[in-house]
Amino acid sequence: MKTNTGTSEISPAGLNTFKYKENTFGYVSGLALLNSMGVSTQVPANIEIYTNNETATVRDIQVGSQKVTLRKSRTIINSDNVAVLRFLEMMNTVSPAFFDDDNKAIIKEYISSNNISRQSITKHAPVFPDKVMRNLIESEVIYDIA
């Protein structure tokens, strides 16, 4: 990236924030998503990002020393649906056994603070694998959604 003082490299964290979060045309997924939600302490070696701006299904890039996997979005990502898409992606990443009382409390807070409704889940669930809805039911997280 060009700056007034020369060329500057964007850190992987800066890439996620500057290019994908503020403009709301993408979101972090995988272990990085679980870590950002506070339900995992694992720090991934590879950051996965779903974005509207990717034409290839999957593409790996290097940002500094960090490997970043860019994935084509399942549907158009915008500020209105990014929270529910992140939630559904999280449900696609984990198994029902993952939801102990602590993780359920964190997810319940995420659902509440982002106003995720059953209607928004119903609207976006068809673009995700069946595993997402099965995990919602088996984990009993579905009962925390208004």
Question: What residue ranges belong to the model's regions?
Answer:
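Positively charged, aromatic-accented nucleic-acid-binding surfaces
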Residues: T17-F18, F25, S29-A32, M90, ...
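Short gly/ser-rich loop at a beta-strand->alpha-helix junction or flexible surface loop bordering the NTP-binding
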Residues: M1, E22-T57, Q62
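Short beta-edge/loop segments at beta->alpha junctions of small alpha/beta modules
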Residues: M1-K19
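A diffuse structural propensity rather than consistent per-protein peaks
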Residues: E9-S11, S29, S117-R118
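Hydrophobic alpha-helical interaction segments
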Residues: R71-A146
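Surface-exposed beta-strand edges and their flanking turn/coil or helix-capping segments
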Residues: T41-V43, Q62-S65, V82-L85, D102
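Detector for Asparagine
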Residues: N4, N16, N23, N35, ...
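A short, charged helix-loop
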Residues: G64-K72
